[in-house]
Every structure is written in structure tokens, then in C-alpha cells.
């Protein structure tokens, strides 16, 4: 895994330089008109909320450095799922592992520390129990019996997550023929996904089948399940060139659109090959063909994996320097996240870090004390919380009886070892208060905070000649404050966990669709959209501050 983060070569500007000096002011005596007149629907806050999650790594797609026991009777080289399938007693070994690796105990513990999402890595062969034809023409064709029980466990996991108020990101970790050279892509053979048209077609079928199976399963539940937030089309793809992957991505999205049963498909998550700038520019330009819903769009999310322990440069850098680089707002890391978040947000999408850890080379550690790792974790969290729609730590745990505790990689070990915070996100101390008294209190807070923010905004821009519509700032502030409160009060599955807007740029873009003052006739953002956007973000942050003070 080559985890290299390159900065952008160009700056994505919020707006063009104004050519005229026109100003639209608001009377402080007249409350601004909000554009977001309806509260967020349940489907909205589930997909757009901040996802703070953990990968359930080595549950279905197995990795020997995480869990050794299932590999002990595998065929040589005993490093991949296919090797296990070829070995002795594979069916019994795998089903025992699936039934014991993540249990009610783990679900309860994850919820107790504020985790509200899980990412589940799957191989296409794990779907064969519901669609036997998915194995046709693939390496796993002879092993239907071994894997036929996986799909039932996967759907049980979706139900278990829902009971704890958690969303699920489904990740195609292993595609037919392997999309990268690592053994966690299903086999120990060389990667041959992108070089073989047959495998590319089988990969499209896998996405179609996965989408259909997920949607029909969720719709079959009473009430229907809404906690599938996204389908990640490929994990860490390593194409020979970008063109072949980008064409496949567009074709795969078309399969999602056709296969999803119902009106609202989940978000599309795209691995960006550690070429964040390039894939941001491309996905923004191609947003219409990448969005999961052909009529009204939806979320398109780039997935960046950030590790600092694999390259020679990383292993020769101290953890203190890694931490400083993350916190430096002028560094390539922060700038890249900011520019990607803002550019994709304007299109209707965002960025996440779906794999990260505090795994470090021994050469990077100085004191070998928990605090230096904790500082590194805190720095990462600060960046991801600021710019990303979500994050998922890699991974829940390692096989302790074999490998012992590992605070660098095992999430449970990291929390218990003080390397990761004991809880993340807002945790409610009081229940939802919909009384008239609370509405009046909240209205007073909004009015006071909005006026102060508006005065500062107007004063700052009064020094710079240009065309402005400050009324939009006030309207945005109002919408941001009210919408974030709607997210706070929208969660009902977990009495302590609190939802909040995660993909802010994308959510603002959704709220602006069809509003003449904010959107041009061709669907692009209007001249003064940036003022609404700035106001919305400030209002949302003010709501978070107020909610934390009053309810947490």
C-alpha cells in the first residue's frame, strides 16, 4: 500500500473577482428569509451526517496479519481467501470465524464509544449464497459451497448495525481477477482485473448484483432499512492508467442506477488511487454521470486512505514530524483536503478517509510512550473532522491470542490504551426538547449569533470593492443553524449518539438546488452563492456550539 498525499497544483477559488461594486444589505429589523423551508428527511440525515466509523477488517475478506487461525489449513502460499477455500475444512473454518469475529459484544462496545458507522470489506464471492452466477468464469467458481453462507451473515451485520444506530458502507474489497497486487484482493495470484475485459465485465456484474441484493434486502425488512450509506465500487484500485478505471467507474455507476430497487440509491464511493487532485477534477467534471441517481443526483464521495508507515520517506520521519505536517494549515495535506472538500462540495460530493490508523514504523517512534501516538491520532482527527464527511479507522481488532494487543492498528486496543479518545462525536446528556420554551431560547440564540456574524461579514467585505448580496449570508446562517439542529434531533436509534451535518458542502448544494438566487439556469452555482455558503457553515457551527453547551 503506497499512501502518498500530493498537494494541488492549482487553487480552486470560491468565486471570480468582482468587476463591479454593488451591495445588497439586510435590515437587522427584518429576519432573513430561509431557503431551506423543509427539515431534512430521515434518508438525508443518514447519508449526509458525519460518519465516525471503524472497518470490520478481516471479517469477510481475510488478512493473515490480522487473523491467523483461518489460514492454518489453507493451501500455499496461505495468504488469501482463495488459498483458504482451496485448503482443508474451509467451509467450517470460515463459518466459525464469521460467527465469532464480530458479535453483540463488539456492536455494543462500538456504540458506547460514539462510533456511528462501519465499513464492511467484501469480496464478490461472498455474495454467491444469494446469486450463484456471480462466481461464473472466476477463480472462485469451484467454491460456492464454501462461501454460500456469507450473505446471510452480511445481512445480519446490516441489521445489527441498524439496531445500534450505525450506518454501513459496503466496500468491494476483492474484484474478479484482483484490482491490486495485495492478497487482501481475494487471491495470491498477480492482479489481472484491469488487463482482462472478461474480469472488467464480471466486475460490473458484481456491482450490479451487490446493488440489487442490498436494495431488495433492505426493502424486505419491516420497516425498510435505511442505513446503507454507500457502495464503494473498488478498494484501492491500481489501474495501468486512469482512463480504464474512470471508464469502468462510469459504467459501474450506470449498473447501480439500473439495479437499485427504489427511488433513492446510496452514495457512490470512489477510491482515488492516491491521486487526489486528478480524481477531484475528473469527478467534478463528470459528476452528472457519477451521481447515483440520474434524475436528482446524490452524493459522490472520494475515498482517500492515509497511512504513514509504508514508504521509505514515512519510516524515516518521526511521529512528531508526521503530527506537525498534519497540523500545519499551510502544508500540502491540509490544503489538499480543503480544496478537495470545497471543490467536490460545490458539485454535490465530498471526501472521506475510509482507512487510517496510528500504525507507525519503529524508526518513527522516539519515546515509545502512548502520548506520541495520541498526538498523532488527535492531529488526524482534527483534519478529518474539519474537512471530511467521515472517517473509518482500520481496523476493529487483531487476533489477540496470536498477535497480542496492537494500539497502532486495533481500534479497541487503541481506545483502551489511551491512544484514541475514549469517545468521539457529541454525546447527549439530555433528551430532545421540543417545548415552546426551548424554541424561544434557540430563536434568541440564533438571532444574537447571526447578527454578530453578519456584522463581521459585512464589515470585512465593505473594505473590498465588489458585487455582494449579504442577505444571502444571513439566509445561509439561518438555514445552517436550523438544519444542524434538525440533524441533532433526527437521530432516534441511539439515545446518546447525535447526528450532525458531515458533508456540509454537498448538503448546502442540495439545499440550493432550484433556488434562483443561488443557482444559475444551467445548474451551476450563482454569483453570490459563496455568501450563502459562508453563512450556512457559520450557522451550522454556531448550532453545534449551542447544542453541545445545552444538551451535552
Task: State what each model feature region is.
Residues 38-48, 103-113, 157-162, 286-293, ...:
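Short amphipathic alpha-helices and their capping/turn segments at secondary-structure boundaries
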Residues 402-405, 409-552:
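C-terminal functional modules
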Residues 345-432:
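Substrate-binding cleft of secreted/luminal carbohydrate-active enzymes
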Residues 64-79, 132-144, 177-195, 408, ...:
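Aromatic- and acidic-residue-enriched segments that line the glycan-binding/catalytic groove
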Residues 121-125, 173-180, 394-400:
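Short, solvent-exposed turn/loop segments enriched in Gly/Ser/Thr/Pro and often Arg
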Residues 31-32, 178-332, 339-362, 386-389, ...:
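Active-site region of glycoside hydrolase catalytic domains
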Residues 36, 97-118, 128, 134-174, ...:
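An active-site-proximal structural segment forming one wall of the substrate-binding cleft
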Residues 2-116, 500, 504, 509, ...:
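N-terminal carbohydrate-binding accessory modules
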Amino acid at each position: 500500500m503506497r499512501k502518498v498525499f500530493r498537494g494541488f497544483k492549482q487553487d480552486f477559488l470560491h468565486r471570480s473577482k468582482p468587476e463591479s461594486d454593488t451591495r445588497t444589505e439586510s435590515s437587522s429589523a427584518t429576519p432573513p428569509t430561509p431557503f431551506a423551508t423543509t427539515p431534512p428527511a430521515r434518508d438525508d440525515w443518514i447519508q449526509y451526517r458525519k460518519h465516525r466509523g471503524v472497518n470490520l477488517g478481516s471479517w469477510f475478506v481475510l488478512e493473515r496479519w490480522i487473523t491467523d487461525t483461518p489460514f492454518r489449513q489453507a493451501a500455499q502460499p496461505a495468504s488469501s481467501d482463495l488459498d483458504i477455500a482451496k485448503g482443508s475444512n474451509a467451509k467450517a473454518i470460515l463459518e466459525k470465524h464469521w460467527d465469532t469475529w464480530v458479535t453483540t459484544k463488539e456492536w455494543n462496545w462500538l456504540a458506547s464509544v460514539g462510533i456511528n458507522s462501519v465499513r464492511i470489506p467484501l469480496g464478490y464471492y461472498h455474495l454467491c449464497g444469494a446469486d450463484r452466477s456471480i462466481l461464473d468464469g472466476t477463480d472462485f467458481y469451484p467454491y460456492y459451497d464454501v462461501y454460500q453462507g456469507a450473505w446471510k451473515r452480511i445481512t445480519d451485520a446490516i441489521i445489527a448495525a441498524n439496531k445500534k444506530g450505525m450506518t454501513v458502507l459496503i466496500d468491494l474489497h476483492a474484484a474478479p481477477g484482483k484490482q491490486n497486487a495485495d492478497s487482501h484482493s481475494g487471491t495470491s495470484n498477480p492482479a489481472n482485473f484491469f488487463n482482462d475485459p472478461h474480469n472488467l465485465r464480471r466486475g460490473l456484474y458484481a456491482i450490479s448484483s451487490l446493488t440489487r441484493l442490498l436494495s431488495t434486502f433492505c426493502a424486505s425488512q419491516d420497516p425498510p432499512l435505511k442505513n446503507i450509506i454507500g457502495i464503494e465500487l473498488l478498494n484501492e484500485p491500481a489501474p495501468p492508467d486512469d482512463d480504464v478505471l474512470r471508464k469502468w467507474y462510469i459504467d459501474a455507476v450506470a449498473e447501480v442506477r439500473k439495479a437499485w430497487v427504489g427511488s433513492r440509491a446510496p452514495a457512490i464511493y470512489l477510491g482515488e488511487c492516491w491521486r487526489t487532485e486528478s480524481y477531484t477534477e475528473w469527478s467534478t467534471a463528470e459528476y452528472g454521470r457519477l451521481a447515483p441517481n440520474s434524475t436528482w443526483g446524490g452524493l459522490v464521495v472520494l475515498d482517500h486512505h492515509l497511512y504513514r508507515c509504508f514508504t521509505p520517506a514515512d519510516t524515516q520521519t518521526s511521529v512528531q514530524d508526521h503530527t506537525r505536517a498534519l497540523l500545519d494549515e499551510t502544508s500540502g495535506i491540509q490544503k489538499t483536503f480543503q480544496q478537495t472538500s470545497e471543490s467536490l462540495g460545490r458539485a454535490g460530493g465530498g471526501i472521506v478517509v475510509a482507512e487510517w490508523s496510528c500504525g507507525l514504523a519503529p524508526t518513527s517512534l522516539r519515546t515509545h510512550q502512548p502520548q506520541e501516538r495520541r498526538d498523532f491520532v488527535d492531529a488526524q482527527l482534527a483534519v478529518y473532522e474539519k474537512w471530511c464527511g467521515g472517517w473509518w479507522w482500520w481496523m476493529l481488532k487483531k487476533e489477540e491470542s496470536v498477535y497480542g494487543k496492537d494500539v497502532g492498528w486495533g481500534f479497541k486496543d487503541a481506545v483502551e490504551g489511551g491512544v484514541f479518545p475514549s469517545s468521539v462525536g457529541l454525546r447527549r446528556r439530555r433528551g430532545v426538547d421540543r417545548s415552546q420554551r426551548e424554541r424561544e431560547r434557540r430563536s434568541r440564540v440564533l438571532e444574537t449569533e447571526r447578527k454578530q456574524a453578519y456584522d463581521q461579514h459585512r464589515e470585512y467585505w465593505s473594505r473590498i470593492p465588489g458585487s455582494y448580496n449579504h442577505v444571502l449570508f444571513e439566509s445561509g446562517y439561518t438555514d445552517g443553524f436550523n438544519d444542524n439542529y434538525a440533524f441533532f434531533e433526527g437521530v432516534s436509534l441511539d439515545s446518546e449518539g447525535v447526528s450532525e451535518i458531515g458533508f456540509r458542502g454537498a448538503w448546502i448544494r442540495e439545499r440550493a438546488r432550484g433556488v434562483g438566487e443561488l443557482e444559475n439556469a444551467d445548474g451551476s452555482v450563482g454569483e453570490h452563492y459563496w455568501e450563502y455558503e459562508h453563512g450556512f457553515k457559520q450557522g451550522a457551527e454556531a448550532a453545534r456550539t449551542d447544542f453541545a453547551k445545552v444538551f451535552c
